[in-house]
Each structure stands twice: as C-alpha cells, then as structure tokens.
Design a protein with these regions (language model features):
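Short, charged juxtamembrane terminal tails flanking transmembrane helices
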Residues: 215-219
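Sec-dependent N-terminal signal peptides
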Residues: 10-17, 203
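Extreme N-terminal export signal peptides that direct proteins to the secretory pathway
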Residues: 12, 25-26
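A short, hydrophobic C-terminal helix/tail in secreted or cell-surface proteins
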Residues: 193-213
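Bacterial N-terminal signal peptides that target proteins for export
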Residues: 2-11
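Surface-exposed, well-ordered secondary-structure segments
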Residues: 26-189
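N-terminal signal peptide c-region/cleavage motif recognized by signal peptidases
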Residues: 20-22
C-alpha cells in the first residue's frame, strides 16, 4: 500500500505540474537562431532567392520547405518586392514603407522566424532605428517585440505552445525605411510526450525502485 501511495503521489504532482504549464501556455520570443531551432521540430526556410528584383501583386502563396504560407502587405499597398544588395541574395519587402508585411501559415505551425532589417526605396539594405514584430496564435495570444537597430544578421523567432496564425513586421513611420525579411523560417513543434506517457514513465520508475529495494532486502 505504501508503494502504491508513493507512485500515485508522484503521478499527481506531475499531473499538477503539467496543468500549471498548460495554464501558462503562450508565445516565446527568441533573438538567437540557434536557440529558436533548438526549441522547435522540423523547420523549412524560404530564402526568397527565386524572386526577381521586381514588384509582385500580393498576396503571394509561397512555401518554406514543405510548409505553405501566404504573405501580404497593407493597408496602403498590396505590392510586394523582391530586393537585394547584390542581385544574388534576395529578400522580401513591401511597396509602402508604412505598411505591415504579414505572413499566415497555411498549416498548423508552432514557430516562425527570420532575419529582419531595413531597406530603402530601391530595396538596398539600410539602417533602421527599430522594427516591430508581432505574432498571434490560435489561442488568441499575441506577442510584440521591438527589434532595436536591426542589422542584416538580426534574427527574431516566435514559438507558440499552440498554432501560430499570423506574423507581421513593420518599420512604423521611419523616413526612408521599409521593413524587410530574409530567410523566413517556419517550424513545427518538438514532439512532447503526452501526460499519459509521463504517468507510465513515473509508474515504471516507481516499480523499478520497489524491485531494487526488494532485491536488497533479500540479499
């Protein structure tokens, strides 16, 4: 009876911990590409290198690896531009510097990220004071992050315990600066054992401990 009480107590504590974790579910912000990748499962990347340095009528339907999404801009212009410093590494920006560039995954995804910086009227990278990035998930949670003095290598990623439904970036009203994204990352969640699996693991550990004690008593 004592062993049964012990296992049940541990299992109950673990269940309460899982419930408490779920109650604080939401969106986590990452500013390191390696940390972001460590927090997600499979990831696809859209490099935008198939785009011409030209304008496109949005919204566009694209994919990052096997993960489809749409990208649009607004409210002032629906134009989307492929842009570059060297016509080799292409990035994506909007047609109006005041607009939001918004990404919407077509399938349930847990993470979105990329490299964010400013570009000028001609699409060349340019210094920006800040960019504002926002993500919303299927539970209604929304997180905004202000990326100060972004550079070409500034990475930001969002990971949700639910499914992300939209992600946007804007440069606000900074003269001569357009919000720009390169190497968009879309990711599924890391596989996490179900509560039942945790319970089986804990019960198994309790049984192993009991067997070990019985063997020592017999020795």
């Amino acid at each position: 009876m004592g062993i049964q009480f012990s296992v049940k107590s541990v299992f109950a504590s673990a269940t309460l911990l899982l419930v408490a974790t779920a109650a604080h579910a939401g969106i986590t912000t990452y500013t390191s590409q390696s940390s972001y990748l460590a927090a997600v499962g499979g990831t696809g990347v859209d490099t935008f290198d198939d785009l011409d340095v030209s304008d496109y009528q949005g919204p566009l339907t694209r994919s990052a690896g096997s993960y489809a999404y749409t990208v649009g801009t607004g409210p002032n212009s629906s134009q989307i531009w492929g842009a570059s410093d060297d016509y080799s590494d292409i990035w994506l920006t909007g047609g109006n510097r005041l607009d939001l560039v918004t990404f919407a995954p077509s399938t349930p995804l847990a993470g979105v990220g990329g490299f964010f910086f400013g570009s000028d009227l001609f699409g060349f990278s340019t210094p920006a004071s800040y960019l504002t990035l926002s993500a919303t998930d299927s539970a209604g949670a929304t997180v905004s992050y202000r990326l100060n003095t972004p550079t070409f290598n500034s990475f930001v990623g969002f990971v949700s315990t639910g499914n992300l439904v939209s992600f946007s970036v804007t440069a606000g009203n900074q003269p001569g600066v357009w919000a720009t994204v390169n190497d968009l990352h879309l990711s599924v969640a890391t596989a996490v054992p179900e509560p039942e699996t945790y319970g089986m693991m804990l019960a198994g550990l309790g049984l192993l401990g009991y067997i070990g004690r019985r063997q020592r008593q017999r020795a």
